[in-house]
Amino acid sequence: NIPWASKMKGIYNGEEVPVMHACGHDMHTAILLTTAKILYEIKDEIPGQVKFIFQPAEEGAPPGEEGGAELMVKEGVLKNPDVDAIFGLHVWSGLYAGQVYLRPEGIMAAVNEFRIDLKGVQTHGSTPWTGRDPIVTAAQIVNSLQTIVSRSLPLTEAGAVVTIGSIHGGVRSNIIPEDLYMLGTIRTLDNNMKATVLERLEQIVYNVAESNNIEAKITYLVSYPITYNDPYLYEEILPTLERVNGEKNVHL
């Protein structure tokens, strides 16, 4: 019963349910509106032009549709006047009010969401040798995927995460199902690491599946690039943040 609960409804599992995305994006809008109001009041003191960009679909458009920053850029948001630099922010629950965290280069991870489909041969659990088990194969794949980060990446340079968050397969305790699918997420702060993770993901999934005589398919669902802070602009803005917030409140 939170006071800011959304009144919107959506369909989930065939039923109408309340829908809310409580990531703080309403705060982003309020912050940008307030910034625009303040800068408008001192516009004669600003040696240049400032453009305020309100981005819809901040976390991506619905499947099959265009939206977010990519569509805005395509439609000319960075033109007339041309944009030389962009500064943005994201609220963070781990920081107290008045505190700022920033760093040069990668600050928020790239996201790649994927689906793995496995197809075997259904059989009764009492005679597993007469079928091909996608559940055993899935277990081997999940375990093997954990070695991507721990054994294939230089973690002293940047972090990365590979997560399987959802597995769906089977309907009874004594039936080995024909198929199964898994949903997962990759997060990386370095493009070379991302390429390595994607390469190793495919090697592991297809080779483990083949070793179990299982058909496998990987589908990439969503891809967001790294949020990257230009090192020059980072150095330019740092003194201002320290002056406004106090050095002790700026975390690097």
Where would I find each of the regions flagged by the language model?
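Residues within alpha-helical segments
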Residues: A36-K37, E70, A139, T185
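Histidine/acidic-residue-rich, glycine-tolerant segments that coordinate divalent metal ions
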Residues: I2-M20, M27, D44-S166, V171-I175
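Metal-dependent amide/peptide-bond hydrolase catalytic core
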Residues: V136-L252
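Conserved strand-to-helix beginnings and helix N-cap segments that scaffold or border functional pockets
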Residues: L32-L33, E65-E66, Q99, P128-G131, ...
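Hydrophobic residues in beta-strands and at strand termini
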Residues: Y40, L118-G120, T188
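Residues within well-formed alpha-helices
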Residues: T34-T35, G67, T137, V208
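Active-site alpha-helical elements of protease catalytic centers
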Residues: H21-L39
